[in-house]
Amino acid sequence: MKIGFVLPCYNEFENIFILIKQIKKIFNNHLIVIVDDSSTNEIKDKIIKYKKIKYFKRKAKSGRGSAVLFGMKKILQDSKIDLIVEMDTDLSSHPKELPKNIKYFKRKKLDLLVMSRYLKGSKIKNWPLKRRLFSFLSNKLAKFLLRVNVSDYTMGYRIYSRSATKHVINNCGKIGDGFIVLSEILAELNLNKF
């Protein structure tokens, strides 16, 4: 099984290399696609030394959601990739739980699995109070509006099937290009019975 990782980033110079090392320590058969949303720091020169990584720097800041959709398109060019993992690069999540979550994903034959900061035993790391409050309120609003059975609507740590990813890149990104795409993806996949 080959896994594709989509890592949208913006000014995450230190964190991106920590995350890459964490992923490489756990997974052998993978491709990492980094979509740099026009960071002011230069990571390309350090990224080149890594194998199994494709790096794309966008000319202008276009938003996290459009970065993820762009990364998904690039990942799907590799026909051997079975699962796509979306992860934020701010180190708020760690890939060490992924093997267990991937087993669950495959056993249940899911098309989407969203990790959560709001389930029992979950933790939010490295976040100031303002960001925690914004996330909490955004989730409450999304839950009220979308009514999709997930506990964390704004979590950027997800596993997608190849078919769900194809559907996402063909049907999402129409209502915005930032964090709203996270909720748009949930609504779109739920509406289409994924």
Language-model-detected regions and their locations in the chain:
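Cell-envelope/extracellular polymer assembly enzymes that use nucleotide-activated donors
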Residues: 2-4, 31, 184
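Short, well-formed alpha-helical segments that are part of the catalytic scaffolds
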Residues: 11-25
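Donor nucleotide-sugar binding loop of glycosyltransferases
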Residues: 12-15, 39, 94
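Short beta-strand/loop segment that forms part of the nucleotide-sugar
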Residues: 30-39, 58
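A conserved acidic beta->alpha catalytic loop
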Residues: 36-44, 91
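Acceptor/aglycone-binding surface of glycosyltransferases and processive sugar-polymer synthases
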Residues: 54-74, 95-179
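Short beta-strand-to-loop acidic/aromatic patch adjacent to the donor-nucleotide binding site
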Residues: 80-90
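Catalytic donor-sugar/metal-binding loop of nucleotide-sugar-dependent glycosyltransferases
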Residues: 174, 186-194
